[in-house]
């Protein structure tokens, strides 16, 4: 089966899930799947996807896995005790053909946030792997290895010795086996230039650093959970700080557009959080504005970390490193370009939260095509509240 362990997911799912357990245990949510590739027919694979999801829902955390989580400094003991009783419930997820009969599939995940938050990453990995093992039954692994070696060689120059990257590629990987090979190759060829991986399963198996803090769903849910919509970003960051007391201090900057983030990310947050993550829009412009924002708030940018994670490849990593090296701390999360580049067109698939407690939620991405909401009226209202202009 494709998913061997409930740890085969991104670390930020657990860091967010802990906040949900402690602060929002009653929240009810809905997630929806979307494939952005035109003309891709996923309907022939529905039965296989359902079978893999059924297997996922049979998994439990082992004692060794729970001990590993307990050893992470930011994971609290009561959360690990909860995970010892936890399993994913199949009744919360449905996989079916689109009523439009256009080759698209509908995957919806509806239920308590606490009991559905761990579905997204493994379900996406399942869809990806089922699709590629059916469309590419004899993959050209030699080509994948050649491409990977070529990319990693770009980083092995003296002037890039401090350029560090991480694997963020679980959800859109070609296969679990390929992601593992990529990770081990990166460790062998990059050494200390590999910061770690977002995948907790592989981090545990191969003694790597697990990486991650928060995702958009956390900030989106706070639109419904906070006291006032305009204050929901501040509310989310303050609740995060209440949970982690300065640990896991990387804020995600594009849920309401970068202008709104800078308005909310005041002197207090500049000092409190260790840094900020970029996930949409022009990364060069974003980095310049972020460095300037720290300076304007009398915070030395060289003490803060800028993490870039939006559709990166290695040449782009190098460009960003050369632009900002010495001006701030830097980290780069590379996903699909590492874990799904064997010469085939990767699937552009996402699962996004669309409702919380019966209310629509959305993100106003700095890359307009990433915006996903099933209620145009709410999206318009959200833009008005956060002074974000709709894309032309």
UniProtKB/Swiss-Prot annotation:
Disulfide bonds: none annotated. SUPFAM superfamilies: Nicotinate/Quinolinate PRTase C-terminal domain-like, Nicotinate/Quinolinate PRTase N-terminal domain-like. Gene3D superfamilies: nicotinate phosphoribosyltransferase (3.20.140.10). Transiently phosphorylated on a His residue during the reaction cycle. Phosphorylation strongly increases the affinity for substrates and increases the rate of nicotinate D-ribonucleotide production. Dephosphorylation regenerates the low-affinity form of the enzyme, leading to product release. One of its GO terms (cellular component) is cytosol. Its EC number is 6.3.4.21. Keywords: Ligase, Phosphoprotein, Pyridine nucleotide biosynthesis. The keyword Phosphoprotein applies. Pathway: Cofactor biosynthesis; NAD(+) biosynthesis; nicotinate D-ribonucleotide from nicotinate: step 1/1. It is an enzyme of class 6 (ligase). GO terms for molecular function: nicotinate phosphoribosyltransferase activity. One of its GO terms (biological process) is NAD biosynthetic process via the salvage pathway. It comes from the Bacteria. The modification Phosphohistidine is found at residue 216. The keyword Phosphoprotein applies. InterPro entries: N/Namide_PRibTrfase (IPR041525), NAPRTase_N (IPR040727), Nic_PRibTrfase (IPR006406), Nic_PRibTrfase-Fam (IPR007229), Nicotinate_pribotase-like_C (IPR036068). It catalyses: nicotinate + 5-phospho-alpha-D-ribose 1-diphosphate + ATP + H2O = nicotinate beta-D-ribonucleotide + ADP + phosphate + diphosphate. Catalyzes the synthesis of beta-nicotinate D-ribonucleotide from nicotinate and 5-phospho-D-ribose 1-phosphate at the expense of ATP. PANTHER family: NICOTINATE PHOSPHORIBOSYLTRANSFERASE. HAMAP family: NAPRTase. Belongs to the NAPRTase family. This is Nicotinate phosphoribosyltransferase.
């Amino acid at each position: 089966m494709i998913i061997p362990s409930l740890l085969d997911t991104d670390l930020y799912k657990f860091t967010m899930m802990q906040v949900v357990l402690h602060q929002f245990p009653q929240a009810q949510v809905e997630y929806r799947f979307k494939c952005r590739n035109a003309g891709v027919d996923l309907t022939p694979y529905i039965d296989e996807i359902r079978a893999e999801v059924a297997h996922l829902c049979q998994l439990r955390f082992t004692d060794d896995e729970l001990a590993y989580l307990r050893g992470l400094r930011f994971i609290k003991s009561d959360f690990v005790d909860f995970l010892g009783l936890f399993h994913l419930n199949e009744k919360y997820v449905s996989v079916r053909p689109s009523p439009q009969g256009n080759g698209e599939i509908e995957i919806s995940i509806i239920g308590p946030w606490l009991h559905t938050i761990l579905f997204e990453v493994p379900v996406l990995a399942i869809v990806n792997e089922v699709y590629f093992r059916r469309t590419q039954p004899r993959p050209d692994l030699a080509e994948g290895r050649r491409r990977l070696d070529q990319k990693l060689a770009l980083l092995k120059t003296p002037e890039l010795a401090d350029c560090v990257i991480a694997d963020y590629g679980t959800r859109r990987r070609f296969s679990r086996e390929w992601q593992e090979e990529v990770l081990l190759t990166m460790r062998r060829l990059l050494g200390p230039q590999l910061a770690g991986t977002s995948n907790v399963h592989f981090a545990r198996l191969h003694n790597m650093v697990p990486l991650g803090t928060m995702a958009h769903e956390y900030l989106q849910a706070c639109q419904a959970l906070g006291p006032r919509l305009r204050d929901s970003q501040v509310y989310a960051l303050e609740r995060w700080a209440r949970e982690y007391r300065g640990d896991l201090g990387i804020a995600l900057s594009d849920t309401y557009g970068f202008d709104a983030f800078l308005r909310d990310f005041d002197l207090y947050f500049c000092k409190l959080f260790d840094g900020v993550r970029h996930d949409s829009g022009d990364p060069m412009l974003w980095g310049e504005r972020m460095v300037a924002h720290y300076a304007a708030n009398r915070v030395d940018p060289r003490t803060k970390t800028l993490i870039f994670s939006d559709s990166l490849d290695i040449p782009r990593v190098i460009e960003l490193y050369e632009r900002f090296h010495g001006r701030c701390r830097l980290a780069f999360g590379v996903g699909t370009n590492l874990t799904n580049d064997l010469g085939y067109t990767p699937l552009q698939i996402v699962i996004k939260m669309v409702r919380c407690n019966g209310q629509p939620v959305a993100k106003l991405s700095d890359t307009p095509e990433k915006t996903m909401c099933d209620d145009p009226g709410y999206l318009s209202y959200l833009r008005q509240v956060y002074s974000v202009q709709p894309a032309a």
